[in-house]
């Protein structure tokens, strides 16, 4: 179910939307710990569970695997996808994997610049990633913002 529908339904029913966020382990061997945590979180009937994208792209491929586990537990997943360390080919691969696993909600983010790693140039901002994903038409997108003005913006007007 698309997140916008979850929020609409909750509003109509006067309910609060409960969600959790998990992150992929730094090592693949730790994934069982995440699965155990998901089993416990699912018992609390959250509307969705957000799955972050590996910091600096590390173990990022586990995002889809963990999001699929969330879905198998009967909870809607929200998969994070960052762009600063990805090119079009890697983003397309992630999107194909999300789609094959039935994941339809993506939180599109720029991601952190990793010291000593040159950012990819295909998507400089989350808005570039959103436009690319939206053109596919397969996913519902969520985004983040900096209400206090993004650190790289000259001022509020430029940021908006």
What is the role of each PLM region?
Residues 22-28, 46-64, 112-121:
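Glycine-rich, proline-tolerant flexible connector loops at the mouths of alpha/beta enzymes
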Residues 57-82, 123-143:
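Alpha-helix-loop-beta-strand connector modules within alpha/beta enzyme cores
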Residues 83-100, 120-124:
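Glycine-rich anion/phosphate-binding loops
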Residues 105-158:
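Conserved anion-binding
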